[in-house]
């Protein structure tokens, strides 16, 4: 994954959705 291409908040939201 290339971190830094998107805001940290948006990235965390994606992680939450994937983990849910």
Curated annotation (Swiss-Prot):
The protein, known as: Uncharacterized protein in proB 5'region
Superkingdom of origin organism: Bacteria
Lineage: Bacteria, Pseudomonadati, Pseudomonadota, Gammaproteobacteria, Enterobacterales
Species per Swiss-Prot/TrEMBL record: Serratia marcescens
């Amino acid at each position: 994954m290339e971190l830094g291409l998107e805001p940290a908040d948006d990235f965390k939201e994606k992680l939450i959705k994937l983990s849910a």
